[in-house]
């Protein structure tokens, strides 16, 4: 199985999410009252393997590649907005932009919904 360029990029972003999740967890362990950082770290760590799984399912033909890529992209966009807003609020005491966290949350939910479609919509058979 060979990964397409977009799949490699999505997998790399999943790895970055995992790395940032570990870094935020470590930072939050040393900052009293860093609940928002703990939440951001958990979201990053929980979603990184899901993104990798979606990339793998799509690339292997177990799911429709297009649906898997959309789901992974929505999860990544959601993480950027949700975790980014929580982190900016914690470190700089202002919002990323108005409604960034809720928008990110909706993108995460949409990503999971498309992930459900990946499971329910049969993959195309090879010709």
Model-based region annotation:
Residues 1-2, 122-127:
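Short, charged juxtamembrane terminal tails flanking transmembrane helices
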Residues 6-30:
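N-terminal signal-anchor transmembrane alpha helix
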Residues 10, 14-18, 71-78, 104, ...:
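Hydrophobic alpha-helical transmembrane segments of polytopic
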Residues 16-24, 36-63, 73-84:
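Core segments of alpha-helical transmembrane spans in multipass integral membrane proteins
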Residues 27-31, 54, 61, 91-92, ...:
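Helix-loop junctions at the membrane-solvent interface of multi-pass transporters
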Residues 35-42, 95-106:
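Non-cytosolic membrane-interface motifs at loop->transmembrane helix junctions
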Residues 46-56, 107-118:
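Hydrophobic cores of alpha-helical transmembrane segments in multi-pass inner/ER membrane proteins
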Residues 85-100, 118:
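Membrane-helix boundary connector in multi-pass membrane proteins
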């Amino acid at each position: 199985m060979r990964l397409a360029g977009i799949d490699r990029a999505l997998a790399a972003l999943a790895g970055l999410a995992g790395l940032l999740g570990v870094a935020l967890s470590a930072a939050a362990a040393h900052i009293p009252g860093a609940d928002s950082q703990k939440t951001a770290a958990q979201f990053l760590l929980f979603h990184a393997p899901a993104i990798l799984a979606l990339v793998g399912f799509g690339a292997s033909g177990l799911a429709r590649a297009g649906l898997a890529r959309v789901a992974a992209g929505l999860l990544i966009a959601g993480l950027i907005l949700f975790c980014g807003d929580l982190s900016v609020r914690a470190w700089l005491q202002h919002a990323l932009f108005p409604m960034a966290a809720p928008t990110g949350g909706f993108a995460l939910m949409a990503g999971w919904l498309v992930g459900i479609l990946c499971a329910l919509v049969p993959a195309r058979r090879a010709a």
